Amino acid sequence: MYVAGSLSSQWEERLDDMVAVKEEVVDVLDQGLDCSQAWRQGLALAEELGHGDNLMGMAPDQSRFLGHSVGLQLDESPVVAEGFDRPLPIGGTMAIEPKVVHSSGSIGSEDTWVRDEDGMRPITMDGAIPWITQW
């Protein structure tokens, strides 16, 4: 997240929370569990952190997913959402992108991952640079 000036502590906390949701989703997929299980656990954490009404949109117009596979098309199956009762296959790639949306703005994380025999591996930056860079 690049910020001109400074980011309020409220927005920094929201970003930290979405990074935690991302880590929860990655952990579930890393274990080879179903994408629907990753959705349920990510959603539960977001709700526990107080973001249930703003996760992936503002209620009632929220998207009901936390990530999607990437391939020949940008959005492919499986999706981190209810009803995708299968794991991300070995060799599969997935963009994991939890966000919170408020009338005053939105913030979240997005990185792309591949699942190999050892689990989930980032193929984009995933924290290799600071989550917030101010200038």
Describe the residue ranges of each PLM region.
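Active-site neighborhoods and metal-handling regions in enzymes and metal-associated proteins
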Residues: 1-135
